[in-house]
A protein has these predicted regions:
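Non-DNA-binding regulatory cores of transcription-related proteins
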Residues: 95-103, 108-130
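Short phosphate-binding loop-to-helix
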Residues: 80-96
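A polyampholytic, Gly/Pro-enriched intrinsically disordered region
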Residues: 93-103, 145-156
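Short glycine-/acidic-enriched loop or helix-start segments at secondary-structure transitions
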Residues: 14, 59-60, 86, 113-116
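Residue-level signal for well-ordered alpha-helical positions
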Residues: 62-63, 117, 137
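Domain-level recognition of soluble alpha/beta enzyme cores
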Residues: 121-155
Length: 161
């Protein structure tokens, strides 16, 4: 199973390079809201991978804190600072066979492209802080093929309630 999370809403206001852009206040609130809502899913995770971009790392740390995921399960990977999706796929396929449940914090268009290619539900756009959970019937990540989209959860889903 893979839990894919797009980083929360980030700021363009500071004069910093793209990689260093921080989360906006809205992004911080969305990450809190979404991660607390996921507690009910009782996710059991073996590994958490995050892009090393500031906005993805911050989103990941909020989720990990609220979901009580141990810090030693997280790895930063510059290859996930990927917008096309080729590196995302490579990172997933190279995961150890002992990793059954994986959580990834990354970027668009890589995430939307991945969930549409490997899930069974078409999603126009995974929004900032959007979560998509996919399940696969495989023994090794390198054998990745079409899976099942188990869940989509976007910030607007929780705000409209």
């Amino acid at each position: 199973k893979i839990v894919l999370v797009r980083h929360a809403k980030s700021s363009w206001e500071l004069n910093v390079i793209d990689h260093e852009r921080p989360l906006k206040e809205k992004g911080l609130k969305d990450a809190e809201l979404m991660s607390k809502h996921l507690i009910q899913d009782k996710l059991s995770l073996d590994l958490v991978l995050s892009s090393d971009a500031n906005r993805a790392k911050t989103t990941a740390s909020i989720f990990m804190n609220n979901l009580n995921i141990e810090n030693d399960k997280m790895q930063l990977d510059h290859n996930l600072y990927d917008f096309a999706g080729r590196n995302l796929l490579r990172v997933i396929k190279s995961c150890d066979v002992n990793v059954e449940n994986l959580m990834i914090f990354g970027h668009n268009h890589a995430l939307t492209s991945f969930v549409n290619t490997y899930g069974n539900k078409i999603i126009d756009n995974v929004p900032t802080c959007g979560v998509v959970i996919l399940e696969f019937n495989i023994d090794r990540w390198e054998d990745l093929n079409k899976g099942t989209t188990l869940k989509t959860l976007f910030p607007k889903d929780l705000k409209n309630k």
